């Protein structure tokens, strides 16, 4: 339950390319717009010589600052640096990714003239902080509690890393829920009035960087996931990459120039390709057009929808494999699926829709929910349920999700012994008794794996721990009880107990592949606070600078005004003009001064200008400026209402 004074609980869809935030208010979900008026916020973080930018501001300057603008952190989170997908992505990324402690991918940027390294969790935490601030600005109160979504096919380490990102951002992550399950909630509430009896629903969720398929049965508010499948490295970004590679070859063919892969050129090309891809969802042909792409040469290349489909057809077909796997795992025939629901921006691609419709023998696809907002919508509903804020319409909803991958441990000969098969409903707890492999064995090494292969070397090692102090005895005699316990977030705890001695040991899977320690998380929390206060200082500095600039130029306009200028003595006029010129000159040479320096200059200028302007108003007997007689300036308050209004307006520059 959310504590008092913590504000409403929010739902955050932390996407690869875009993120969204929703809240349950007035018996409905509100997807909240950011300060630019957009309901989607780019999952981008940029670092410059003077500040850190997050969201739209970061994405808008990416072409000018590609090597210090970070995106796609979700494709790095919870992975090893040596993972094939991490290595493959590096050629498409302008920013630097290096191997950190425990093979953790670290992102290298230049921030305020210094080389810095950030973990993917830290970048994701910055995006989460931005989403939290968007919600706080809308709600007018602080927000502490959130439900955050992850792809259904995220493994244990990716889920735990996402939870860590929430902690670093200062959020209490009440629950990690699967994106297709969240979308199913949006679908279920949309259909609640008209739905009767049990329905089998397939959620097809193809986003910017990840792909999930989940099959659920929905009946009277109970959402039971039967099976899930997917690919945590397939989405719109991959379709963009194909277009970028195609365009590079086109440019080389037409101009006999090989674009040196300088980040700025590639970034401009990628932005144009992404725009073309979106256009091709609604038209049959478009043009990729970039002025002066490389060495002054313009790039102009028409592209048809058919060509785009040809470039990506293998990836589009690959999207159908998890659909088949999901139906197989759920032991369900495709004819028994009542609705196929499209979620994620990439489901707008006509060829993807056509392949899916053909697979389901021409069945009409369900497009009644917003594919971009459905996940955040479901997360906001779940947040309301967990914090006790929702009405009776949502409080009786029950989510029964599953674990996407089989979990087990290594037994003699490197065999994977499964304790929890994939698609087991969570939370769940399974126990099994094991024994020793050799005589007088003093301890056992328990190695925990996830995956579907029979040999552990082909699966993913999550973590390991030792149970020592086993009394000497023949092989097969000691009894070691191993317990696997998965919580509602899909995060695994493993414990082992020697039944003879009562000796116990346990592990919350903090795998060996770069999971953050408690100390590292604490350090990152402190750094996040530091960056936040630096951002606030920068904002204050800009506001103080703008205030001084506006005041100086406004005073100059007032003095130059013939009606007002005529009322000033030559000495006063000269005094004000000299003070204004000195301030403007100081501003030009001190753009990087601190906020208090701008404030001091402001006070200095006001102390010269205000008394003269006040004297002029009094001398005019209040007959100036149309009814401003009671609004005379006071020291430190600006010269009359016109100036005060202008000082306020500086916030909009």
UniProtKB/Swiss-Prot annotation:
Location of this chain's protein in the cell: Plastid, Chloroplast membrane
Location, primary (coarse class): plastid
Keyword Plastid applies: yes
Keyword Nucleotide-binding: yes
Any Gene Ontology CC annotation: chloroplast membrane
Induction line: SCE70 expression is neither significantly influenced by light nor heat shock.
Name of a matching Pfam family: HSP70
InterPro entries reported for this sequence: ATPase_NBD, Heat_shock_70_CS, HSP70_C_sf, HSP70_peptide-bd_sf, Hsp_70_fam
Residue ranges of the TM segments: none
GO BP, sorted A to Z: chaperone cofactor-dependent protein refolding; protein refolding
PROSITE patterns: HSP70_1, HSP70_2, HSP70_3
Gene Ontology molecular-function annotations: ATP binding; ATP hydrolysis activity; ATP-dependent protein folding chaperone; heat shock protein binding; protein folding chaperone
Family matches, as Gene3D superfamilies: 1.20.1270.10, 3.30.30.30, 3.30.420.40, Actin, Chain A, domain 4, Substrate Binding Domain Of DNAk, Chain A, domain 1
Keywords annotated in UniProt: ATP-binding, Chloroplast, Membrane, Nucleotide-binding, Plastid, Stress response
Remaining remarks: There exists a 70 kDa heat-inducible gene (HSE70) in spinach leaves with sequence homology to SCE70.
Family: Belongs to the heat shock protein 70 family.
Primary role: Sce70 may play a role in the transport of polypeptides across the envelope membrane and into the chloroplast.
Record protein name field: Chloroplast envelope membrane 70 kDa heat shock-related protein
Species of provenance: Spinacia oleracea (Spinach)
């Amino acid at each position: 339950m959310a504590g008092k004074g913590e504000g409403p609980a929010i739902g955050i869809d932390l996407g690869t390319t875009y993120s969204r935030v929703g809240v349950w208010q007035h018996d409905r979900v509100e997807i909240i717009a950011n300060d630019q008026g957009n309901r989607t916020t780019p999952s981008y973080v940029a670092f410059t010589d003077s500040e850190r930018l997050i969201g739209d501001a970061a994405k808008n300057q990416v072409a000018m600052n590609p090597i210090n603008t970070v995106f796609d952190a979700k494709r790095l989170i919870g992975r090893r640096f040596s993972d094939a997908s991490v290595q493959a992505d590096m050629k498409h990324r302008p920013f630097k990714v290096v191997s950190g402690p425990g093979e953790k991918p670290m992102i290298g940027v230049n921030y305020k003239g210094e080389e810095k390294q950030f973990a993917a969790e830290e970048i994701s935490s910055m995006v989460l902080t931005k989403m939290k601030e968007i919600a706080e600005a809308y709600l007018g109160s602080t927000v502490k509690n959130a439900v955050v979504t992850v792809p259904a096919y995220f493994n244990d380490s990716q889920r735990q890393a996402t939870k860590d990102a929430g902690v670093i951002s200062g959020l209490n992550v009440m629950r990690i829920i699967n994106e297709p399950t969240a979308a199913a909630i949006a679908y279920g509430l949309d259909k609640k009035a008209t739905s009767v009896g049990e329905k089998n629903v397939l959620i097809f969720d193809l986003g910017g960087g990840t792909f999930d398929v989940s099959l659920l049965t929905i009946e009277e508010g109970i959402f039971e996931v039967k099976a899930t499948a997917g690919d945590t490295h397939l989405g719109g970004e991959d379709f963009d990459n194909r277009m970028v590679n195609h365009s590079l070859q086109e440019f080389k063919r037409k101009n006999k120039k090989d674009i040196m892969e300088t980040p700025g050129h590639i970034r401009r090309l990628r932005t144009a390709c992404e725009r073309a891809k979106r256009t091709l969802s609604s038209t049959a042909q478009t043009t990729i057009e970039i002025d002066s792409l490389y060495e002054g040469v313009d790039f102009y290349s028409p592209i048809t929808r058919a060509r785009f489909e040809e470039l990506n057809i293998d990836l589009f077909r690959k999207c159908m494999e998890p659909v088949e796997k999901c139906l197989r795992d759920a032991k369900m025939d495709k004819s028994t699926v009542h609705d196929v629901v499209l979620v994620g921006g990439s489901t707008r691609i006509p060829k993807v829709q056509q392949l899916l419709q053909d697979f389901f023998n021409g069945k009409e696809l369900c497009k009644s929910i917003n594919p971009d907002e459905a996940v955040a919508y479901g997360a906001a509903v779940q947040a309301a349920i967990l914090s006790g804020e929702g009405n009776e319409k949502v409080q009786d909803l029950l989510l029964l999700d599953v674990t996407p991958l089989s979990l087990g441990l290594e037994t003699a000969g490197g065999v994977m012994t499964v304790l929890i098969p994939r698609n087991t409903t969570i939370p769940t707890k399974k126990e099994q008794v094991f024994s020793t492999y050799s005589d007088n064995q003093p301890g056992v090494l328990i190695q925990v794996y996830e995956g579907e292969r029979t040999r552990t070397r082909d699966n993913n090692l999550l973590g390991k721990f030792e149970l020592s102090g086993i009394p000497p005895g023949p092989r097969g005699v000691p009894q070691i009880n191993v317990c696997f316990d998965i919580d509602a977030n899909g995060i695994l705890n493993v414990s082992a107990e020697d039944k003879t001695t009562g000796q116990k040991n346990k592990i919350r899977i903090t795998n060996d592949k770069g999971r953050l320690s408690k100390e590292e998380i604490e350090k990152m929390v402190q750094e996040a606070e530091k960056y936040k206060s630096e951002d606030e200082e920068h904002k204050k500095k800009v506001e103080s600078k703008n205030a001084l600039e506006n005041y100086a130029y406004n005073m100059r306009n007032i003095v130059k005004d013939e009606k007002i200028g005529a009322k000033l003595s030559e000495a006063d006029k000269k005094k004000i003009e000299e003070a204004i010129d000195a301030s403007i000159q100081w501003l030009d040479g001190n753009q990087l001064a601190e906020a208090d320096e701008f404030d001091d200059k402001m006070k200095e200028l006001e102390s010269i200008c205000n008394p003269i302007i006040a004297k002029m108003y009094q001398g005019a007997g209040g007959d100036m400026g149309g009814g401003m007689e009671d609004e005379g300036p006071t020291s430190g308050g600006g010269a009359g209402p016109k100036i005060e209004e202008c000082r306020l307006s500086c916030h909009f520059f």
